[in-house]
Structures are given as C-alpha cells and as structure tokens.
C-alpha cells in the first residue's frame, strides 16, 4: 500500500501525489462511490498501485477538517476572496463563507481584490467590519500589485484554498502570486453582475512549500446542513458579548435582554454582520420548511 494526498478529482478519477511527488491516477471502489464526499481533494489516502491497470484507493485516512463548499479536506487555511467592486461586495455571501469556515474549524482570512477600483474610505468601510470581528483582512490589487507580497508571505508553507463568488479574481490572484499557476481567467458579465465560471474543479497546486487551490466560483450559496441553533457560534465576535444575555442559550433575536443585540446597537458589532446572521437564520428556516414538504 502506498500513501499520498488527493490533489485533484475529476470525472471519477483521483490524482494522488505521493511523498516523492509522483502523481498516480486512481479510482475508488464501488462501495466508496455510494458515500457522498467519501474522497475529496486534500484527503490523505492509501492506495494499491497497479502499473498495468487502474490503481485503487483502499483507505481514506482521518481528516483534520472538511468543508463542503468548496469541497476540500485537510486545509490549513481558506482565503475568502471577494472584489471591492465589479462585482460589488456582498456582505451576506462573505458572512456565509466565513460561517462555513468557522463550522469546519478551518482558519479563514478575507482577501479583498480590485482595491484600485474604490477609494480608501470605501475600502476601509468593508475591511473595517471584518477586522472588528477578529479576522485578518488582506487588501490587494492584481492590476497594480498592491498587497500581494503580504498575502504571499502569509500563504507560505500552508495548504490553502481560495474560495469566493465568480468574477472576483481568484484565478488572477493566484497567477499574480505565482505566474502560470492558474491559467484561466474570466470577466464579469455586465448583464448579471457576476463572473463567468472559469475554474471547474478544485486542484491543489504546489506553492512555496505548501499548496494553493483555486476553486469553482458561485453566484449564490445556500446555508444547507447548518443547524439554526448552532449558527451563533459561527459569528466569532458574538461570544465577546454573550455574557450580557439573560437567557442561555440565547438566539440573539427576540430575547428581551441580549448582550449581542446591545452590542449591535452600540456599534460594537457591525450591523451588517448581525443582519447577515438574521438572514441566514431565515434561510435555514425556509430550507427546513421546503425539505419538510417533500
């Protein structure tokens, strides 16, 4: 048996990199195929090498972490990538992605691209919200190169993935960090205000002692498989004010004495973050109702 890491999976084939950097194309057995997310990019596996036929993955080793969207495992970091403009920044989408990362137990940072399209005040209006919430925020421009060195230094030696909506410049950022690492880039559609998908699957690419992954973009993101009762845990700044809640647990919605709601009123928690929290709660409720009707 040989050990390795899945660096790409596409059309039922799994490309496994061994410790000596050999890439072996593998399949998985039928029983594994029946389990959703049984093997994903980033998984450490053991496989039976067959030089005369298909090599077969036999075992998926224990995961450090797993994220469903993008579908990857064993990440050190996820870079939540958004544009400041073209397409416009979406607080709700950013907050969903950060909540998903918190749920998965993966370190997340926010990377704001296209800073050359906005003023300093506009940039700080976005970045300040997330720095206040306790996140590291990188501000970059692939047009003029601003901020790329700081991001590159942070990513050195890590297994990281870039995730975000279509058209925000994920592939362009990767190409700026290491020329040629991600070749396809696309423009934002003027009609729909979103990017055209150019990355079709997640692939780990060697980068400065670690790996970087570009991942497929998206136009929308559903809050599936999140328990409404657990959502507050995924807004990291809430915990700093929960001591002011009269009821435990507190949903931070209708309760008369709530430290989180007070913090929002006092400007200690950004109103946009709290609005995203309420919107995601409503979405979870709606998804649950629709599921119950099936």
Describe these PLM feature segments.
Residues 1-10:
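Structural detector for short beta-strands of small beta-barrel domains
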Residues 12-16:
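Short aromatic-glycine-enriched beta-strand elements
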